[in-house]
Curated annotation (Swiss-Prot):
Designated name of the protein: Ribosomal RNA small subunit methyltransferase H
TM spans (from-to): none
Gene that produces this protein: rsmH
Localization annotation: Cytoplasm
Alphabetical UniProt keywords: Cytoplasm, Methyltransferase, rRNA processing, S-adenosyl-L-methionine, Transferase
Natural source organism: Rhodococcus opacus (strain B4)
Amino acid sequence: MVDHEGEDSSPADGFGHIPVLLHRADELLGPALTANDPHGGGAVMIDATLGLGGHSEHFLRTYPQLRLVALDRDPHALEIAGGRLAPFADRITFVHTRYDGIEDALTQAGLSPRESVHGILFDLGVSSMQLDESDRGFAYSIDAPLDMRMDPTTGITAAEVLNTYSHGDLARILSTYGEERFAGKIASEVVRQRAKEPFTTSAALVELLYRTIPAATRRTGGHPAKRTFQALRVEVNGELDSLRAAVPAALDALTVGGRVVFMSYQSLEDRVVKQEITPRSKSKSPEGLPVELPGMGPEFRILTRGAERASEQEIEENPRSAPVRLRAAERIARRSAA
C-alpha cells in the first residue's frame, strides 16, 4: 500500500500493481514462518492490510503449508483478493475489519490473540486500488467525490469533514495529520468557501489549495494538495488511532520467535510504530545491575537499523515505493505476568 503515490511483486503482477519491498519482507518473516517446517507447516501469518493480496499470494505460494489470516477494512479489496487467492482458500481466513481488529480476527479464526502467530505484515497507507478508483476521492490528480473512506460502508466522508468541522478542528487536523504549515490559512479559506457552496468534489478543494498556498512554497514543496489530502484521509479513517491500538495487539499476538514487519509511508505512521515497539525492546531492569532480573528483560529484538528505505533500483521499477519506511521486530521472550 502507499501514501498518495502507490503499492509493490517485482515485476508487476497480473493485477497491475507491484507489492512494495516484497523480497525484504520475505527475508524478515521467512525465518519465523519456517522455524518448525520449511514449508510453513504449523505456522500462522497475519496480513493486516490485505489490499489486492500481492504480498499474501507470495507467502502462500512460497510456504505451501502456511495458514493465513487476512484482514482488510475495504470490502471491495476483500472481494478482489478473495478471487485472486481462491487456489489457497483452504488455508485462509478472511476478516472484514480494520487492522486494530487483530484480536477479534484471531478469535474468529479459532486462534488465541496471545502468542499464537509466527509472522505479521502491515503495509500501511492507501492502496493502489483505492488510488486508482476514481470515485473514491483519494487522488488529488483526479476530480472525484470527496469520499476518502477506506470502508465505504461506514463513517464520515472527507466532504462532511470540510463542510461541518469548525475552523479550529480543521486547522488542527491539517497541522497534526498533514504537517501543513498553512493549516490556519487553509482552514479559513475552507470555511469562507463552504459558506458560498459546500465542498463535494476534489477539484474544488485542489483549486482552493492552489489559491491559498503561496507560489514560492508550491514551487519547492511538492503538490500543494498532498498534505491536506493526507490529513483528511487520516481523519476520515481514524488511521493513527487504529494504528496505535493495532501495534500492541500485533506484538501481543506473536509467539516467541515470531516476527512482525511494518511498512509505513509517512512520518506520522512510522513514528507511531517506533514509539510502540521501542519500549518493549528494552530491558526493564535497573541500570547498573550485573544480571538481568527475572521477567525484566526485553520482549523484542529490533531487526532493522532505524527505518529501512527502498533501494534506488526498486524505486525505479516501482516509483510508489519511494516513501516507504520499513521496521521489523522479533519476539525473544514471553510477556511477563506483570
